[in-house]
């Protein structure tokens, strides 16, 4: 590509367009969410595994304010929402990227009615937000075991100690 907007930018979907754009995705539609602040191997592996569970993958990102409310530190997120969205959208495994400013993605999950809801292995299925709603519609909820134990918080600790 020479100049112009990269094609992956088209995957960035404002929340108010999610329901309509979800209809155009091949199914089953998989949904996951998180901060994805400093992308690492654990993130990309989990996203690739999530995508393998269906025909498309929607990733919902916490807004910057939502990340701050999680208590990860005043300097988090390191990367602003627009940058995190672009990096996630550039991944081959990702079909759409959206965001939520609430403490949980429950409203987005209800709006886009995914067929499969996924979180990383640190989330037991019974604690995954939206699990009851997805299961009630006949969908599946999966907790994907970590293949590569990585942590953004640990990476930041290591960087700060240098």
List each model region and its residues.
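Nucleotidyltransferase catalytic core that binds NTPs
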Residues: 1-162
């Amino acid at each position: 590509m020479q100049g112009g907007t990269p094609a992956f930018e088209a995957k960035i979907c404002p929340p108010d367009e999610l329901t309509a754009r979800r209809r155009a995705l091949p199914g089953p539609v998989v949904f996951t969410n998180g901060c994805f602040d400093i992308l690492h191997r654990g993130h990309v592996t989990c996203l690739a595994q999530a995508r393998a569970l269906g025909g498309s993958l929607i990733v919902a990102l916490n807004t910057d304010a939502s990340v701050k409310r999680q208590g990860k530190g005043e300097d988090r997120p390191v990367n602003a929402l627009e940058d995190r969205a672009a990096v996630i959208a550039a991944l081959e495994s990702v079909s759409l990227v959206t965001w939520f400013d609430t403490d949980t993605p429950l409203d987005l999950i209800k709006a886009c009615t995914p067929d499969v809801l996924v979180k990383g292995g640190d989330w037991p299925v019974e604690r995954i937000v939206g699990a009851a709603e997805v299961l009630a519609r006949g969908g599946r909820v999966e907790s994907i075991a970590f293949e590569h134990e990585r942590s953004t918080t640990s990476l930041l600790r290591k960087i700060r100690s240098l």
